[in-house]
Amino acid sequence: MRQRILRLSIVLISVLSALALFGCGSASAPDGTSFVLNRDGSVTQTIIGTNDDMIGRNDLSAFIEQQVEAYASGRDEPSVELNSCSIEGNRISIELQYASIDDYADFNHVPAYDGDVEEALTKGFLFGSRFLTDSGLEYSGYTIPVEYPEMRVLVLQEPMTVSIPEKAVLYSDNMKKNDDGS
């Protein structure tokens, strides 16, 4: 049964932040910061925050555009794009589009990875956590690299809602799945 479950899915989610939230639905109207891994490998990030400094939308948008332009300099194609920036009261909402997860990681200066387990290990990511299935089965993270080196894995370290294009069969025990099971 265990091998069948794991063979049916190539997706393993390992979010290393103890506060991370997980979802497989749409992130079009998030309540907090969200990360959407799209089918084409691009990433959509929505950042929700508070405007304690009472910065204006134009100033905030100009600052983000400046960061995007600085990141784009020296690159052949644009890889980060500001989709939207809004301020309502003291609530800030920013949506950024990244060409790839590598652009997301580089732009935000955070570790992030999408690929197979074997390559994740060569990049220094470890799988020491416990992993759970929807049915409540537990797996040691230490057995995953040995038994399933070609399994797909998504590694993030930030507390946020995560949405993926496929159903996750395993997820780390420091995550919370949405009430609807996603």
Model-flagged regions — what are they?
Residues 20-23:
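C-terminal motif of bacterial Sec signal peptides marking the signal peptidase cleavage site
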Residues 38, 50-52, 97-101:
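Solvent-exposed residues in well-ordered beta-strands and their adjoining turns
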Residues 25-27:
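Bacterial signal peptide processing site
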Residues 85-182:
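Mature, soluble, non-transmembrane domains
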Residues 33-34, 79-87:
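Short amphipathic beta-strand and strand-loop transition segments with alternating hydrophobic
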